[in-house]
């Protein structure tokens, strides 16, 4: 029997690579008519890269993007609030920033294309004694030893595993864009915190910079109202920024790509049912404030493949969730907190936030970094 994966995003492709390496038969279906990554830039911290190194040549992957040493966080007046590395001190490679389509191309490279079906999705899952009988939208029926929902935040597989799941709105909406620009220090990303808004920037190629811009919104506001914003109108929201923030805001009108979405998260109890399991955003979508969403999907794929190879049975999926949920919940909460801090608006609250952030001891920051960057890949290597 085969393993069926739905979703040709980062989680699904990474898992297909892991199963290929392990010699496990798999079939991947993608409901879109083509495999086309949605988004702009992406960052991979050291824990994500460690998980990827199991099936990818990192030297070749790094040639697709730009090395990332860390991120500096600034106040809206241009003064420094804090710095954060992209790896543990012992990892000399650091992190990586690149276009999403470059990461997808790397994950697709070498995969057996005959095992990937586009324009196809799961329409029915029926429990068997030692398998799941899956009917696909093309009419074919498959008896599967494992079914994996890697189909993102709007997962359809999740309706089978966890039908009562609901997304929680973060109170922020976000625009992601790519502009033609070369930072003076291309290995350092930056994020500027203003009054209810943030502006981030990361070099993703020698001549392109990824920019993300967030604004505090009320959930009851229609998304389309915020979504139809030109780069020129978007830049005007950050007119009160000084220093590096003002420099980045002036580049927004030159955007070659502009993608908009509200920031949401998913937290709950159930990732598996029988021999069906959710991974990545389908299981635990989180706000992107720590840049760990893709990393969590990659860690999921790394661990699930290893556990399944050792014990290919339904109980293994319960063990998988037990081994992952504490780490996922910690990072989800930390990311949510960062987003909430960025939403503070009044002059007094912004002053208080900036003061408190600057007062956080270096030892506390190091402990946070240790927890962030010690993923399942690092644990397996120890």
Swiss-Prot record:
The keyword Mitochondrion does not apply. Its EC number is 1.14.13.182. It catalyses: 2-heptyl-4(1H)-quinolone + NADH + O2 + H(+) = 2-heptyl-3-hydroxy-4(1H)-quinolone + NAD(+) + H2O. One of its GO terms (molecular function) is monooxygenase activity. It is an enzyme of class 1 (oxidoreductase). Keywords: Monooxygenase, NAD, Oxidoreductase, Quorum sensing. One of its GO terms (biological process) is secondary metabolite biosynthetic process. InterPro entries: FAD-bd (IPR002938), FAD/NAD-bd_sf (IPR036188), MOase (IPR044560). Involved in the terminal step of the biosynthesis of quinolone which in addition to serve as a potent signal for quorum sensing, chelates iron and promotes the formation of membrane vesicles (MVs). Catalyzes the hydroxylation of 2-heptyl-4-quinolone (C7-HHQ) to yield 2-heptyl-3-hydroxy-4-quinolone (PQS). This is 2-heptyl-3-hydroxy-4(1H)-quinolone synthase. It comes from Pseudomonas aeruginosa (strain ATCC 15692 / DSM 22644 / CIP 104116 / JCM 14847 / LMG 12228 / 1C / PRS 101 / PAO1).
């Amino acid at each position: 029997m085969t393993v069926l994966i739905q979703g040709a995003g980062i989680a699904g492709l990474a898992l297909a690579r892991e199963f290929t390496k392990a010699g496990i038969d798999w079939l991947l279906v993608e409901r879109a008519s083509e495999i086309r990554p949605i988004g702009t830039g992406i960052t991979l911290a050291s824990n994500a890269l460690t998980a990827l190194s199991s099936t990818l040549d990192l030297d070749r992957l790094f040639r697709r993007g730009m090395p990332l040493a860390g991120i500096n966080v600034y106040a809206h007046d241009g003064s420094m609030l804090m710095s954060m590395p992209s790896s543990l001190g012992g990892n000399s490679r650091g992190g990586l920033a690149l276009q999403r389509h470059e990461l997808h191309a790397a994950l697709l490279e070498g995969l057996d294309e005959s095992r990937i079906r586009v324009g196809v999705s799961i329409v029915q899952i029926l429990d068997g004694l030692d398998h799941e009988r899956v009917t696909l939208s093309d009419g074919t029926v498959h008896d599967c030893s494992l079914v994996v929902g890697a189909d993102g935040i709007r997962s359809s597989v999740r309706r089978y595993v966890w039908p009562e799941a609901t997304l929680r709105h973060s109170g922020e909406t976000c625009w992601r864009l790519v502009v033609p620009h070369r930072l003076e220090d291309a290995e350092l990303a930056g994020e500027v915190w203003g009054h209810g808004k943030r502006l981030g920037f990361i070099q993703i190629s020698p001549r392109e910079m990824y920019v993300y811009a967030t604004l505090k919104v009320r959930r009851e506001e229609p998304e389309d109202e915020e979504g139809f914003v030109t780069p020129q109108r978007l830049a005007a929201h950050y007119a009160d920024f000084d220093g590096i923030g003002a420099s980045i805001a002036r580049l927004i009108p030159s955007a070659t790509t502009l993608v908009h979405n509200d920031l949401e998260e998913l937290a709950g109890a159930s990732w598996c049912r029988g021999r069906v399991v959710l991974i990545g955003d389908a299981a635990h979508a989180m706000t992107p404030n720590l840049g760990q969403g893709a990393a969590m999907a990659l860690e999921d794929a790394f661990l699930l493949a290893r556990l399944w190879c050792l014990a290919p049975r339904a109980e293994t999926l319960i063990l998988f969730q037990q081994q992952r949920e504490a780490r996922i919940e910690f990072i989800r909460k930390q990311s949510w907190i960062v987003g909430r801090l960025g939403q503070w608006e009044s002059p007094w609250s912004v002053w208080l936030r900036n003061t408190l952030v600057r007062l956080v001891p270096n030892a506390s920051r190091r402990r946070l970094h240790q927890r962030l960057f010690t993923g399942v890949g690092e644990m397996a290597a120890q």
